Amino acid sequence: MDSNTVSSFQVDCFLWHVRKRFADQELGDAPFLDRLRRDQKSLRGRGSTLGLDIETATRAGKQIVERILEEESDEALKMTIASVPASRYLTDMTFEEMSRDWFMLMPKQKVAGSLCIRMDQAIMDKNIILKANFSVIFDRLETLILLRAFTEEGAIVGEISPLPSLPGHTDEDVKNAIGVLIGGLEWNDNTVRVSETLQRFAWRSSNEDGRPPLPPKQKRKMARTIESEV
């Protein structure tokens, strides 16, 4: 196993522990708590994949961080912070919408890279909107936290979420996953539109209905992909 992979996991475990202590003092805002919950799932998945104990990794990560801090001057810290581009956290969904449990009458699921696409194929003839919480850097989607499809009545009928065991995805990965979700939902004559925030940062062009321009042929191909691969 690559030593950098192990040490990266150890540092991530310790930094998560620090953030958890911060949250336990009721100091974190909603985006902070949301990322904390998502990162916990990711660390569990990575720990299982690597065969590493999280508690042991956290202790090792603490030693690594302490060693770095001992060598770090205040001036170097200021320069590092100034050179790192700041990302923004954007929210279409409330915390309740993100944390709400939902179930599917006719579940369909597809894994696309490090993203999991789920939808209820029992839903027909509905008006559906896609909402997402994600971070943005350089005016482009950086990291998807969670995307969900809602009917006008507020029911959840679809979802795109990162796989905890496979961290890391690009804005193109997210765009392709959204295309698959839209294609699957539209296969049952649902009308799908996308939130303005997601339109702006997930891709640069959309039609007047608030969704990316997908030709009918591509929509049919995407829907068949879901049918054949699930």
Curated annotation (Swiss-Prot):
Segments carrying motif Nuclear localization signal: 34-38
Biological processes annotated in GO: symbiont-mediated suppression of host cytoplasmic pattern recognition receptor signaling pathway via inhibition of RIG-I activity; symbiont-mediated suppression of host gene expression; symbiont-mediated suppression of host mRNA processing; symbiont-mediated suppression of host PKR/eIFalpha signaling; symbiont-mediated suppression of host type I interferon-mediated signaling pathway
Assigned keywords, A-Z: Eukaryotic host gene expression shutoff by virus, Host cytoplasm, Host gene expression shutoff by virus, Host mRNA suppression by virus, Host nucleus, Host-virus interaction, Inhibition of host innate immune response by virus, Inhibition of host interferon signaling pathway by virus, Inhibition of host PKR by virus, Inhibition of host pre-mRNA processing by virus, Inhibition of host RIG-I by virus, Inhibition of host RLR pathway by virus, Interferon antiviral system evasion, RNA-binding, Ubl conjugation, Viral immunoevasion
Major location category of this protein: host cell
Annotated spans, Disordered: 205-230
Assembly notes: Homodimer. Interacts with host TRIM25 (via coiled coil); this interaction specifically inhibits TRIM25 multimerization and TRIM25-mediated RIGI CARD ubiquitination. Interacts with human EIF2AK2/PKR, CPSF4, IVNS1ABP and PABPN1.
InterPro entries with a match to the protein in the record: NS1, NS1A, NS1A_effect_dom-like_sf, uS15_NS1_RNA-bd_sf
Entry PTM: Upon interferon induction, ISGylated via host HERC5; this results in the impairment of NS1 interaction with RNA targets due to its inability to form homodimers and to interact with host EIF2AK2/PKR.
Region (CPSF4-binding): 180-215
Physiological role: Inhibits post-transcriptional processing of cellular pre-mRNA, by binding and inhibiting two cellular proteins that are required for the 3'-end processing of cellular pre-mRNAs: the 30 kDa cleavage and polyadenylation specificity factor/CPSF4 and the poly(A)-binding protein 2/PABPN1. In turn, unprocessed 3' end pre-mRNAs accumulate in the host nucleus and are no longer exported to the cytoplasm. Cellular protein synthesis is thereby shut off very early after virus infection.
Gene: NS
Domain commentary: The dsRNA-binding region is required for suppression of RNA silencing.
Compartments it resides in: Host nucleus; Host cytoplasm
Gene Ontology terms for molecular function: protein serine/threonine kinase inhibitor activity; RNA binding
Protein name as catalogued: Non-structural protein 1
Domain of life of the organism encoding this protein: Viruses
RNA-binding is among the record's keywords: yes
Any Pfam family hit: Flu_NS1
Motif Nuclear export signal boundaries: 137-146
One term under GO cellular component: host cell cytoplasm
